[in-house]
Amino acid sequence: MAKNVAIFGLLFSLLLLVPSQIFAEESSTDAKEFVLTLDNTNFHDTVKKHDFIVVEFYAPWCGHCKKLAPEYEKAASILSTHEPPVVLAKVDANEEHNKDLASENDVKGFPTIKIFRNGGKNIQEYKGPREAEGIVEYLKKQSGPASTEIKSADDATAFVGDNKVVIVGVFPKFSGEEYDNFIALAEKLRSDYDFAHTLNAKHLPKGDSSVSGPVVRLFKPFDELFVDSKDFNVEALEKFIEESSTPIVTVFNNEPSNHPFVVKFFNSPNAKAMLFINFTTEGAESFKTKYHEVAEQYKQQGVSFLVGDVESSQGAFQYFGLKEEQVPLIIIQHNDGKKFFKPNLELDQLPTWLKAYKDGKVEPFVKSEPIPETNNEPVKVVVGQTLEDVVFKSGKNVLIEFYAPWCGHCKQLAPILDEVAVSFQSDADVVIAKLDATANDIPTDTFDVQGYPTLYFRSASGKLSQYDGGRTKEDIIEFIEKNKDKTGAAHQEVEQPKAAAQPEAEQPKDEL
């Protein structure tokens, strides 16, 4: 899980600064409530009674939940007259007696909305709008057939549209193994894509109109615009849809229609190459074209590509500690947090730098605060560039705190660690250190930092363990005394790494 923290953190940072869906203001009403209220006493029985029911898991204190509430209620009112009626329900997941329900349904944030089908046998995430009209339209589609029939060219034009990925199956008849597999996959993926089927390829706006099927045609608003497949093995068909629906280069800007592709980009297991340029400057289109050409060369080699407009990417700049004067720049991040960075990129350097990266000739980039020129306080300051030397190469027993400057618990612990460090000042075998985890990279394959403060202890012999004991001076000292090794370095000064000159272009400012 730790390996994905950096990726999800960046995704959150990116999307946080993009204009989001505007919710209607909450209004009070004495009208009948159409949203069912469920809890641990009636949840399972209610879900089992319905072929299709939507459940919101919420918390009363959640601002987004409060904004959603009137829209959700309005949608429930409208859908109550649908034939058949679509039932919307809610669970207060903040209530102690409902927390098992929240855990059972993998609720990790609020609001979380789930669609339960077939009495709860099939569960899907709700991925639709959060205003009443959008909720109604989305759930009408979700409660209907997984795939709709296209009977005319007008049907096809309306279905395909201009800015989304849709999948159409062309069949000589609506029966047989190929058709059954297509419908089964449509049912599985219906919350992610729109599916349709037809007996006549001539209705479709693009592609070979003479085919009689069976064939699957995927339409998309990017790259080659449509692509066909005749492999109806369910796994192969799902792989075809997943790969074909991903842009060769994902675009990140203020256009909401691009956001699903951005989410898909960050959910990919691939390494993630991100080129940041100013879309409005001269030469931007040349960069995009060259980047697309290079991306095509590497699209089957474990790298996904994104191009971001600087104006829309301030979250990424804060996350990585980048500066606008380094644009054009490219940064590649692995799921383990390792990064590779090239600032002030020239157009003709793009293919050669990426080739050097693929050949393993580019050194990883470490986000780091400047190495302190003086480090004389009892608790030693460690930064990204000195972490390896202080913790792993010093031959000392090192207790290191990973903290955040804004963290209240860290502030409470700070004077205690000072006292611990003072207690060991005469013992050169022991180092008490701290690292600002918001401004310096941490090797996530070594340290699992899920919250602040997180403390680790590495003995002189190399044994690494996370400290989860009491946070009093006495508890921490007792732990160190029990776990430290003798190094024979007593009465010698602890050597601190010297400050090194840092190239301006290669060391971004680290402010998060």
UniProtKB/Swiss-Prot annotation:
Reactions listed under catalytic activity: Catalyzes the rearrangement of -S-S- bonds in proteins
Cellular localisation: Endoplasmic reticulum lumen
Top-level division of the source organism's lineage: Eukaryota
GO cellular component terms listed in the entry, alphabetical order: endoplasmic reticulum lumen
Domain Thioredoxin intervals: 25-144, 357-485
Intrachain S-S bonds: 62-65, 407-410
Residues at the active site: 62, 65, 407, 410
Residues linked to a glycan: 278
Similarity comment text for this entry: Belongs to the protein disulfide isomerase family.
GO biological process terms, semicolon-separated: protein folding; response to endoplasmic reticulum stress
Name of this protein: Protein disulfide-isomerase
Pfam families according to UniProt: Thioredoxin, Thioredoxin_6
Motif (Prevents secretion from ER): 509-512
UniProt keyword Endoplasmic reticulum present: yes
Keywords: Disulfide bond, Endoplasmic reticulum, Glycoprotein, Isomerase, Redox-active center, Repeat, Signal
Phylogenetic placement of the source organism: Eukaryota, Viridiplantae, Streptophyta, Embryophyta, Tracheophyta
Regions annotated as coiled coil: none
Entry's Gene Ontology molecular function annotations: protein disulfide isomerase activity
Organism name: Medicago sativa
InterPro entries attached to this UniProt entry: PDI_thioredoxin-like_dom, Prot_disulphide_isomerase, Thioredoxin-like_sf, Thioredoxin_CS, Thioredoxin_domain
Residue numbers spanned by region Disordered: 487-512
